[in-house]
Amino acid sequence: MHRFFKSEFFNFEFIRILSAAPYGGAEIAECLVAAGQITNDDPESWHRAWIIQADKAKALGDEALHSGDTVSARRAYLRASNYYRASGYMFHDRPGAPDARVLPLAQQVLDTYALTLPLLDTGEASQLKIPFENYQLAAYLYLPRDRTKPVPVLLSLGGADSIQEELYYVYAASGPQLGYAVLTFEGPGQGITLRRDKMHMRPDWEVVVGRVLDFLTAYMQQNPSVQLDLSRVAVVGASMGGYYALRAAVDPRIGACVSIDPFYDMWDFVRNHVSPALLNAWNAGWVPSRVVNGIMSMAMAASFQAKWEVGLAMWFFGVDSPTQTLRHMMKYTLARADGTSRLDQVKCPVLVSGATQSLYLEPESDVLRVFDALAHLGDERREIWIARSPEEGGLQAKIGAIGLVVQRTFRFLDQHLNVTR
């Protein structure tokens, strides 16, 4: 496949932005101009290139709205929101390495995206606040315009580095047109809850989704006109969001689960990136944490991708050293302490996918392990999809093949939620 950047990381993230083009989140020429202004592995040039395009798109949206052209305004605001997201993507704002630009850029994404909501032509959209412990989780509910009968609900979960405004370009842009209500939200360690509220990540996503389902039940009782069919609720997520979807699927209120390119155990991911011998020696107490921290710090200094990945994990876990990050990663697994799998509690149908050209994961050690742990469902209620080439979904999270993953997801959900058109 054609490459735009020498860096695998920058190339992947650029394709990620391009992937939003069919759904209004990018314009090809704008992206190519931005690419020409970006220096490989230079986060500042990445930021500058995308902020320029974001400001231009925002101005075009304002101009179109002023003249009464709501179609062009919607398209421009969607692009601006995505470009603002991209402009801040390479930055972190953790206590040990603060960056004052992170929160204002996140707010620009929110403010610009809010301008699109009344202009969307794919259905109705509203902003919600979901009570969770001592916080309010930001959420969007997208509804089909035709709700003469109750509609199934899809919970679209973000992952480690996505924000829910970006999730629009995947399922929220298509779901309402196919007769589904789609709910997105940002849980602990995600999006604005991390940047503004300083909520850090947690592995037990069944608890988070459980609160969301409780909220939807109360919301439906208070707003019956939304016509949500809470007997037909599905969950979908990609990468870490795929792990979250599998954790959520243990809730008996979930009627179907789609897990796109998940990991089974985050520690396996670590072992693929750091010497297993070093990790084993450190974990056994033979090598002190300061030595591992020093080695990982040198790796971060030598590679921007490593610096970004470790820095992101330190940020969303709320820790200040690489070894503390490793300790937290051990908690993110589908295995119980006794060696059994949490997936034995899943009773709903599950579609799980893998990507052989993933930037991060190995299908053989992750997706097949997930699929095998779902054997109790039988072949009628579990499905596996391992994609090999980019156009077939071979990149992580099916980046570059959004239309295909949307098609396969809703085909699976239609079948198992008894949706007919």
Curated annotation (Swiss-Prot):
Similarity comment: family membership: Belongs to the AB hydrolase superfamily. FUS2 hydrolase family.
Active site (UniProt): 239
Domain of life: Eukaryota
Quaternary structure, from the entry: Homodimer.
PANTHER family reported for this sequence: ALPHA_BETA HYDROLASE PSOB, DIENELACTONE HYDROLASE DOMAIN-CONTAINING PROTEIN-RELATED
Name of this protein: Hydrolyase poxO
Role noted for this protein: Hydrolyase; part of the gene cluster that mediates the biosynthesis of oxaleimides, cytotoxic compounds containing an unusual disubstituted succinimide moiety. The first step of the pathway is provided by the HR-PKS poxF that serves in a new mode of collaborative biosynthesis with the PKS-NRPS poxE, by providing the olefin containing amino acid substrate via the synthesis of an ACP-bound dec-4-enoate.
Keywords: Hydrolase
Single Gene Ontology MF annotation: hydrolase activity
Induction, per UniProt: Expression is positively regulated by the oxaleimides biosynthesis cluster-specific transcription factor poxB.
Pathway(s) this gene product operates in, as recorded in its UniProt entry: Secondary metabolite biosynthesis
Any one GO BP annotation for this protein: antibiotic biosynthetic process
Enzyme Commission number(s) of this protein: 3.7.1.-
Effect of disrupting the coding gene: Impairs the productin of oxaleimides and leads to the accumulation of a trans-decalin containing alcohol intermediate.
